[in-house]
Amino acid sequence: SADQPNSIPPRERKAGCKNFYWKGLTSC
């Protein structure tokens, strides 16, 4: 969830879904 950046780093949130975060998409 993009609402918990403090709990899980955006780049460590999901190895395969880290790209979605940088792009700004929440399709993961």
UniProtKB/Swiss-Prot annotation:
Superkingdom, taxonomy of origin: Eukaryota
Its job: Somatostatin inhibits the release of somatotropin.
Say which family it is in.
Answer: Belongs to the somatostatin family.
Q: From the Swiss-Prot or TrEMBL record, state where the protein is found.
A: Secreted
Encoding gene, per UniProt annotation? sst2
Listed under GO cellular component are: extracellular region
Q: Name the Gene Ontology molecular function terms of this record.
A: hormone activity
Please report the name of this protein according to its UniProt entry.
Somatostatin-2
Which residues are connected by disulfide bridges in this protein?
A: C17-C28
Which species is this UniProt entry from?
Answer: Oreochromis niloticus
Principal localization reads secreted
